[in-house]
Design a protein with these regions (language model features):
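Domain-level signal for soluble alpha/beta catalytic cores
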Residues: 1-330
Length: 330
């Protein structure tokens, strides 16, 4: 039997996948703004291809594309009545791409329905999570990733509903311009509270680029002996605007802010040094980023063909400029 996520994490860091909705938007399959996952039924081949790119890059976990896949969010783009089709398709596609090479995580996310101190809103969130997770479990997932929570209160509801499944649960928070959640909780408080509530893995994802996320991971690591996850977007955020959704290019002109593969590899190395156990990426991270992160973490990845240059043959432009750069005194 294949090792589960918790067994793998006890042995070594685990490499996650990259971002989906912004990349699929760039490829013409997702609407900028809503970023809902109807592509799983409307353009399944595009989703499958992106999953496969991440697997080939070295990802050890593939997430079902079910971010913003609850009934209420899907209803904003006219797909509320297809919540079951979309979530089941999301898991099937992830499973098809993963094969026996990667684990498949179900996916839950913030619902925008949560209201602090409102039992009625909490029950509404519970119902949305239960429905979405139920459809995903019909197909079969290895564990649950609940992500991008701006309120610790809503994240705790994800822990509560996820643990009912009997599967391991990973829950990650997001932090905007302030170093606390919208309900005033620090990264340390979030990590400790989530682990104490039963989350198997706690951490942070999205919004903040690596430079502005890693200090939060360090704070979480100091707060608990539990497993810590980090999934940073591959965007260069600034001290003035530490969250990428606040940058002028968001949502559909983010190319100037994208980090290089080598910058994401350095992020992976730093995350491991801090003590993160699950290291993945988020919006803006494509297969080239994941491949370089895999190399940085000593993970296997599909490498290009092994070739040796023949000095008697003309060089290609790439070889020529690489050779010239190697001998340059600049």
């Amino acid at each position: 039997m294949a090792k589960g996520i918790l067994e793998r994490l006890r042995e070594d860091v685990v490499l996650g996948d990259g971002g989906y909705v912004l990349e699929l938007e760039k490829r013409g399959y997702v609407l900028a703004g809503p970023f809902t996952p109807e592509a799983t039924v409307e353009n399944p081949d595009a989703v499958l291809e992106l999953h496969r790119e991440f697997v080939d890059g070295g990802a050890e976990v593939i997430q079902a594309l079910a971010f913003y896949g609850d009934r209420e969010k899907l209803a904003t783009v006219g797909y509320g009545d297809r919540v079951g089709d979309i979530n089941r398709a999301a898991v099937r596609l992830a499973r098809q791409a993963a094969g026996n090479r990667a684990l498949v995580a179900g996916n839950l996310s913030m619902t925008w329905q949560f209201e602090p101190e409102s039992p009625k809103a909490a029950d509404r969130v519970r119902a949305l999570l239960d429905e979405q997770l139920g459809h995903q479990m019909e197909v079969g997932i290895d564990f649950i990733i609940a992500e991008t929570y701006l309120y610790l209160g809503e994240a705790l509801l994800a822990v509560e509903r996820g643990k009912r499944s009997g599967l391991p649960v990973m829950v990650t928070m997001s932090f905007e311009d302030k170093l606390v959640t919208r309900d005033g909780k620090s990264p340390a408080e979030c990590a400790k509270t989530l682990i104490d509530a039963g989350a198997d893995i706690a951490g942070t994802n999205c919004w903040r680029g690596p430079k502005h996320m890693l200090p939060l991971v360090e704070e979480m690591r100091r707060a608990t002996d539990g497993l810590i996850a980090v999934q940073a977007p591959a965007y260069r955020t600034t001290d003035a605007t530490p969250f990428f959704t606040g940058l002028k290019g968001f949502p559909d002109a983010m190319e100037p802010y994208q980090l290089t593969r080598h910058e994401m590899a350095e992020y992976a190395r730093q995350a491991k040094a801090i003590g993160a156990n699950f290291i993945g990426a988020c919006c803006g991270a494509v297969a080239t980023h994941i491949r370089e992160m895999a190399r940085a973490l000593g993970k296997p990845t599909r490498e290009p063909s092994r070739w040796k240059p023949d000095p008697t043959k003309p060089m290609s432009a790439t070889e020529y400029y690489r050779d010239r750069r190697a001998h340059s005194k600049d």
